[in-house]
Amino acid sequence: MNAERRNGAQEPIRLSDHFSYGRLIRFTMPTIIMMIFTSIYGVVDGLFVSNVVGKTEFAALNFVFPFIMVLGGAGFMIGTGGTALVAQQLGQGNKQKANHTFTSMVSFTILLGVILTVIGIAVIRPVCVLLGATPEMIEGCVVYGRVTIAFTAAFMLQNVFQSFLAAAEKPKLGLFVTVAAGLTNAVLDAVFIAGFRWGLAGAALATGLGQVVGGVLPLIYFLRPNDSLLQLEKKPSLEIKPILKACGNGSSEMMSNIATSLVSMLYNFQLLKYIGEDGVSAYGVLMYVQFIFIAISIGYSIGVSPIVSYHYGAQDYTELKNLLRKSVTLALTVGVALMALAIAAAGPFAYVFVGFDESLFALTKHAFQLFAFSFLLAGFNIFCSGFFTALGNGAVSALISFLRVLVFQASSVIILPLFLDIDGIWWAITVSEMMAAIISAVFLLAKRQRYHY
């Protein structure tokens, strides 16, 4: 019995371990909580803006937010794709190569973040006009957008390090960093919005400074000597081959992020058409709660992916089967629980954001009761996409994400209202998750022989 067990401490978990349900939950729990805190950024902004600033400004924030996520989504691509590559290299016993690849990913993230910042600030106004922002919303969209986009590089770094901290066997450090970033955002929201009355500019600045904490603290950690599996090299590098491979492999996460943002824009367009600004506000509340619920599935996927990549790289196919079986069971179990919670708590969730407006509250509560059924299969679909990314099959992962978010959901948002009116918009996501689950199951069965799970 080792010293840790004699002292009553839990044995540290390694990527090379065999994983029971308890061990799997223990390892992924920090990344799950980490993603929940990350999702709270927008939620806290929304709470303060809706209750302190006003309904029109709340609609403006929700309207421009998808475009901001498109820019920052490249961080998810680099993080998930790069982590799969680095974890496989660690599984093959090549730590030096893993560190060099890791350094290239971080260097590329910073460079791309700066480029996207310049582009985003330049085009934010015409994009908002093109997407149909009302005259009352346009200035709020531009103010919130420009300030938030200024922090794109930090936002991308935060997304990248969320994945790499799990691969470095430091998920608890990732949790600490994200909690610190979330608390920074929440406290500054209170100061800038409720205290200084800076409105949307204050909300955006609070979010941006929170992202600086989330992006810079891990950067400092990996630049200094540390006891993790990964270490940034002193000299920045941009090795094109692994960068392209990581981007290709992680394209599903980028695709999912962009597609989600595009579909959100489509939702806003349809809601403005059918019921006006109140529809956009109601959808914003749904998105905030969905951010938190889906963060559980995304956090699990981020946490389990380096384990999958490691065992695939080590050719331990027995453990690969074990990870798949347990992960699918967990995803479906959590899906049932989240669906039940969402249906039962639709009223309280709506009241927190829009309790000040009776008609908007009624609309939001009804919408959420329909929207809630989507949580049943969402976690399964997210895991399946992440599973194929971890195996290095970015094409299948991207196809699942593309069909799930863009094709199935976009077509449902357009077609269902023709038959079900406004309720068709709220049912669209559930229909898309059902169709995506069929596709995900087909790919899992079709690829069994190739990946030996």
Feature-to-residue mapping (PLM):
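Short runs within selected transmembrane alpha-helices of multi-pass transporters and secretion channels
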Residues: 79, 147-166, 174-185, 203-218, ...
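Short alpha-helical transmembrane segments in multi-pass integral membrane proteins
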Residues: 1-28, 86-153, 195-251, 308-374, ...
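Residue-level hotspots within pore-lining transmembrane alpha-helices
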Residues: 37, 41, 71-75, 115, ...
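Small-residue-rich hydrophobic transmembrane alpha-helices
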Residues: 58-118, 155-174, 282-346, 378-400
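Transmembrane helical elements of multi-pass membrane transporters/channels
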Residues: 26-45, 147, 158, 181, ...
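N-terminal transmembrane alpha-helices
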Residues: 16-52, 66-81, 85, 89, ...
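Helix-terminus/linker motif at the lipid-water interface of multi-pass membrane proteins
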Residues: 40-58, 128-135, 191-198, 254, ...
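Transmembrane alpha-helix boundary and packing residues in multipass membrane permease domains
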Residues: 31, 35, 47, 84, ...
